[in-house]
């Protein structure tokens, strides 16, 4: 976020916490990208703050990223995590002192989460695969309506096609992304793999190594689809250790993931710290063709 917006986001998080009776003194920004993540102390709550521009209706954007859809996704995220916590799945849950819902202050959408102190950075690949398998088992036990992964692909295709959303994308690169998404999604759908609720982006940045064991966070992009879609977001050493995974399907999903990330980096509204530099890198990886690398290797 731009600095003035980030300051307002922190203030909104403080206000939301105070409104529900949580004491707030110091604040620490844990992550600042398209959504701000801030630790509030001494109540030790993690507030995830979505800016007003992401919540307002934007006719040029695809439905996945429209304001109405984004608010629905935040509500779905809270419900999915609430249900997972109830069946003891490995998740960093919502703060139990706060009603499990989306709060709105000064136009910002805010959700309140339990803070878990990290106890190390690297999770061994075998442990990562095991805890992801455990998460998937927990997800199969809950019944929460989520979008299909193809809804997300279709939204990315719309953004790629829109010169208003991706104005700086060269026409050859626009065609590369459009063709990649079209061809791979058609191949994947024709495989008719078994589907279930998924995390949506279980990459290493969304796994906390805590004293309670590894915990998944950030279910904002939870979708319905084959487990191989989730596996396309994790390092290769992890996906190879996941029991009974179709590695060919994982590879195809990796191409989809690279194309989606590239499209996001070229969006006019993207505020990811890596910016256009990573957008170029992902396009170059796609040009090289299969086998596509995991996104963390680009």
PLM region spans:
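A cross-family kinase active-site recognition segment
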Residues: 115-174, 195, 298
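Helix-rich C-terminal or lid/interface subdomains of diverse kinases
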Residues: 236, 244-298
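Juxta-kinase regulatory segment immediately upstream of eukaryotic protein kinase catalytic domains
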Residues: 1-25
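Catalytic-loop of the protein kinase fold
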Residues: 194-199, 204
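Active-site Asp-x-Gly
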Residues: 196-197, 209-254
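ATP-binding glycine-rich phosphate-binding loop
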Residues: 19-41
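A conserved alpha-helical element in kinase catalytic cores
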Residues: 3-6, 10-11, 48-106, 122-134
């Amino acid at each position: 976020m731009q600095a003035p917006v980030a300051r307002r986001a922190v203030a909104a998080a403080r206000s939301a916490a105070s409104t529900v009776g949580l004491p707030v003194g110091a604040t620490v920004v844990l992550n600042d990208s398209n959504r701000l993540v801030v630790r509030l102390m001494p109540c030790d709550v993690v507030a995830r703050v979505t800016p007003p521009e992401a919540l307002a209706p934007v006719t040029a954007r695809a439905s996945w990223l429209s304001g109405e859809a984004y608010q629905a996704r935040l509500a779905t995220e809270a419900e999915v995590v609430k249900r997972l916590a109830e069946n003891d799945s490995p998740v960093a849950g919502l703060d139990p002192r706060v009603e499990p819902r989306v709060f709105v202050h000064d136009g910002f959408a805010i959700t309140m989460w339990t803070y878990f102190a990290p106890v190390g950075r690297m999770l061994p690949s075998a442990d990562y695969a095991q805890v992801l398998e455990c998460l998937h088992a927990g997800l199969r036990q809950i019944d929460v309506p989520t979008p299909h992964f193809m809804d997300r692909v279709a939204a990315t295709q719309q953004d790629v096609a829109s010169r208003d959303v991706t104005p700086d994308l060269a026409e050859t690169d626009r065609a590369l992304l459009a063709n990649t998404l079209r061809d791979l999604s058609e191949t994947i759908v024709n495989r008719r793999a078994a589907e279930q609720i998924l995390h949506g982006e279980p990459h290493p940045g969304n796994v906390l190594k805590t004293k309670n064991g590894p915990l998944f966070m950030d279910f904002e992009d939870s979708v319905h689809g084959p487990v191989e879609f989730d596996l396309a977001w994790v390092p290769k050493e992890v996906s190879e250790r996941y029991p009974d995974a179709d590695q060919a399907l994982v590879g195809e999903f990796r191409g989809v993931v690279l194309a989606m990330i590239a499209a996001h980096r070229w969006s006019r509204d993207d505020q990811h710290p890596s910016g256009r530099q990573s957008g170029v890198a992902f396009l170059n990886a796609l040009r090289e063709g299969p086998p596509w690398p995991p996104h963390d290797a680009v």
